[in-house]
UniProtKB/Swiss-Prot annotation:
Disulphides: 81-86
Gene Ontology CC terms: extracellular space
Keywords on record: Amidation, Cleavage on pair of basic residues, Disulfide bond, Receptor, Secreted, Signal
Gene from which this protein is expressed: CRSP3
Cross-referenced Gene3D superfamilies: 6.10.250.2190
Listed name of the protein: Calcitonin receptor-stimulating peptide 3
One of the Pfam families matching this protein, by short name: Calc_CGRP_IAPP
UniProt similarity note: Belongs to the calcitonin family.
Tissue specificity field: Mainly expressed in the thyroid gland and CNS. Found in the nerve cells of cerebrum, hippocampus, hypothalamus, pons/midbrain and thalamus.
UniProt KW Disulfide bond keyword: yes
């Protein structure tokens, strides 16, 4: 029963669209009869357009690659140690990586394996 209401509605809507000017056929061109009319761009404009297109493509690919690598990235963190032994080892490493000038000028005299650790008690007099 609802089917009989549909064709009059369809015909009425097509008529309204035609009267409103929204329903027009596209102009027909013969593909073989007329020559291809391309947009006129100068050589410089074409090169600028090509550069812009390549730049956008590279930027798009870089964004996609960055999003893919974000999912699989593993960040490394150094263990932090603030005890005297760790700080001493860090300073010794820094001194060994710096030059001999720093070693000669700033190296403390009483540094070595006997300095760290447990010291013997001095006998009291």
């Amino acid at each position: 029963m609802g089917f009989w209401k549909f064709p009059p509605f369809l015909i009425l809507s097509i008529l309204v669209l035609y009267q409103a000017g929204m329903l027009h056929a596209a102009p027909f061109r013969m593909a073989l009869g007329s020559s291809f009319d391309s947009a006129t761009l100068t050589e410089e404009e074409m090169s600028l357009l090509l550069v812009a297109m390549v730049k956008d493509y590279v930027q798009m690919k870089a964004t996609v690659l960055e999003q893919e690598t974000e999912d699989f990235s593993i960040t490394t963190q150094e263990r932090s140690c603030n005890t005297a032994i760790c700080v001493t080892h860090k300073m010794a490493g820094w001194l060994s990586r710096s030059g001999s000038v720093v070693k000669n000028n700033f190296m403390p005299i009483n540094m070595g394996s006997k300095v760290l650790g447990r010291r013997r008690r001095q006998p009291q007099a």
